Amino acid sequence: VHQQLRTLSKENAEGVAQHLVMVAALLEAEEFDAAMAHAETAVRRAGRVPAAREALGMVAYRTGDFARALGEFRTVRRISGSDHLLPLMVDSERGLGRLDRALDLAQSPEAKRLPAQDRVELAIVVSGIRRDLGQTDAALVALQIPELKRPKQPRLAYAYADTLLGLGRDEEAREWFQRAADADEDYETDAVERLEELDGIAVTDLLPGEEELAPLPPEERTGDGADRA
């Protein structure tokens, strides 16, 4: 991003950088209106800077405005020459209901040249499209990429587990949810909760700072012991 901003004046570059930092922070906090305001300001001040257009596209994507997101991602691709947003472009086509177009884009030559982590994200999106089409077997095949056998791919393992579950292959699904949970150091998924559901363990959500209380002994329960007439 710093390299991209060097095309701007020093004062403008500093201002745009601050807006981009705010976009990232506000997206993390899910304050989408404020994030959009900062992203739009960044684009007004630096419309030819890929990072600014990408920020605007990301806010649009997160808020479900897939047409606008797709337009911004295409602009980033055109002015930067990078295909790293291709998985999000495919998912935006999916969000617009254009599933055939999404699959065509996912099978493009550019998609085949994506680096490993982008291929993972694309595989997850394509699998979701296949499930949208009712093609659950094809959805599973879409996830069977080399990265599936490698560690530290919690989202890929999770998607594979969920698809296996959709096929009624519960034991295999449990194994892959466990792999996802073991790899998920950053809590990107709810694999642990899915495992507990499969194992029939009830999960109680506590508010921050609360602790689960042990049941009272019989003599201290209401209506027992000293309270009994």
Language-model segments: which ranges?
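Generic helix N-cap/helix-start motif at coil->alpha-helix transitions
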Residues: N12-H19, A46-R53, S80-L88, P115-I124, ...
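Alpha-helical segment of the N-proximal tetratricopeptide repeat
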Residues: T7-R44, A55, Y61
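Solenoid-like repeat scaffolds
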Residues: R6-N12, E40-G47, R74-G81, S108-A116, ...
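TPR/TPR-like (Sel1-like) alpha-helical repeat modules
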Residues: R78-D83, A111-K112, V141, I145, ...
